[in-house]
Regions:
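Beta1/beta-strand and adjacent pyrophosphate-binding region of the FAD-binding site
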Residues: 1-12, 33
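N-terminal Rossmann-fold NAD(P) dinucleotide-binding loop
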Residues: 15
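Glycine-rich FAD pyrophosphate-binding loop
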Residues: 23-48
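N-terminal FAD cofactor-binding segment of flavoenzymes
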Residues: 46-86
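Conserved FAD-binding catalytic core of PHBH/FMO-like flavoproteins
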Residues: 62, 160-258, 262-265
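Conserved N-terminal helical subregion
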Residues: 74-173, 181-186
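FAD/FMN-dependent oxidoreductases across multiple families
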Residues: 234, 238-325
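C-terminal helical "tail/cap" subdomain of flavin- and related membrane-associated enzymes
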Residues: 313-391
């Protein structure tokens, strides 16, 4: 039985960030184990072909943990965000220049970050990687937790952290209740090339079926997230590239000129999942294991990184017992408001903008017009977009 201070189940974005943050904040004082089912040299589903938008606040957290310098070279800045409603004049714009920041956020490809994180994890002397391996069974005692792996090894620690994704094996084993809501939408994702250079602009276009988001990437590509009812998404996935681009052009419009090229497409169902509790005895939950959100407004990953930052900070306040109940309670209390507010905001936006009822259509267009003309109304959206929220 090998002794550790912290065992982290899951080595994708949330788990890897937590391990590296603990290493930096404690100057390698804590022994950390990362248990990951996928081998380092294989394609990791947590580091797949998708892109994500890192908010200004998330980048600030990564800077604090000394991770941003490694990620920055492969990140594309978002200098402007344009929000509009299809077939209506209402719109609002947010620009980095108006806010007084270098960028509102940055877009990174998960595959790039995966390679960077794997290299950093392997080089860190206080982190041990168990891969390929998975948590098979968990036993909890008064002052420790035993983590039995499917390769026959057993790890003992003061704290187990679940960062093992939306369908968390650790959470299921320990009976952590999961609340779910099916949005009855499917996200179609792909990279596209447009006629006009994006110039750092991101777009969120609301339609009667769901939002269409385009994020700026390197080489003048755009990362597409197109939310549709499942039957329409199935139809769109079967279209030829030419037909797909034509349909996308109809939904998005001509703000970037002609849609010229589309890469490989993928799709996944959109379901809100969140754990009613994010702690238990000698156990904490972060990232997608704690909550998985609708991609509208790009809040999910950034919320998960705020989980990671708060937990890392609380762990380092009590190094003599990193899994103490007092530390976990402080983590829970810190995260409660942000989790509830972000889940409520994203869910409300989905219901407000993903339909064509006349009353809601009028209300959302009026809201966009007012936000574009009254800066006070734009501030809550702006702070959430930037990730500048209390944690």
């Amino acid at each position: 039985m090998t002794q550790y201070d912290v065992v982290i189940a899951g080595g994708a974005m949330a788990g890897a960030t937590l391990a590296l943050a603990l290493s930096y904040l404690t100057d390698n004082q804590l022994k950390v184990a990362v248990v990951e089912p996928y081998q380092v040299d294989t394609s990791h589903p947590g580091f797949d072909s998708r892109s994500i938008a890192l908010s200004y606040g998330t980048v600030d957290i990564l800077r604090r943990f000394q991770l941003w310098p490694s990620i920055a070279p492969c990140a594309t800045p978002i200098t402007d965000i344009h929000v509009s409603d299809r077939s209506h004049l209402a719109m609002t714009d947010i620009s980095a220049q108006q806010v007084g920041v270098e960028a509102l956020g940055y877009v990174v490809e998960l595959a790039d970050v995966g390679r960077i994180y794997q290299s950093l994890l392997q080089r860190c002397e206080s982190i041990s990687l168990y891969t390929p391996a998975a948590v098979d069974r968990v036993e909890r005692f008064t002052d420790s937790v035993s983590v039995h792996l499917n390769n026959g090894e057993t790890l003992q620690a003061k704290l187990l952290v679940a960062a093992d994704g939306a369908v968390s094996n650790c959470c299921q084993q320990l009976g952590m209740n999961l609340a779910q809501h099916d949005f009855e939408q499917t996200a179609v994702i792909a990279n596209v090339v447009t006629e006009q250079v994006h110039r750092g602009r991101a777009f969120e276009r609301f339609t009667e079926h769901g939002p269409v988001a385009l994020l700026p990437m390197s080489d003048n590509r755009m990362s597409l997230v197109w939310c549709l009812p499942p039957d329409l998404a199935e139809q769109v996935m079967l279209l030829s590239d030419e037909q797909f681009l034509e349909r996308l052009q109809q939904e998005f419009g001509w703000r970037l000129g002609q849609m010229q090229k589309v890469g490989m497409r993928a799709s996944y169902p959109l379901i809100l999942r969140h754990r009613e509790q994010n702690i238990s005895h000698r156990f904490a939950v972060v990232g997608n294991a704690a909550q998985t959100l609708h991609p509208i407004a790009g809040q999910g990953f950034n919320l998960g990184i705020r989980d990671v930052a708060s937990l890392a900070e609380e762990i380092t306040k009590q190094l003599d017992d990193v899994g103490a109940y007092s530390s976990l309670m402080r983590f829970k209390q810190r995260r409660c408001g942000d989790r509830q507010n972000t889940i409520w905001m994203t869910t409300s936006l989905v219901h407000l903008f993903s339909n064509d009822y006349l009353a809601l259509r009028v209300a959302r267009n009026l809201g966009l017009v007012m936000m574009d003309n009254l800066s006070g109304l734009k501030q809550p959206l702006l702070r959430q977009t930037l990730g500048l929220v209390s944690r």
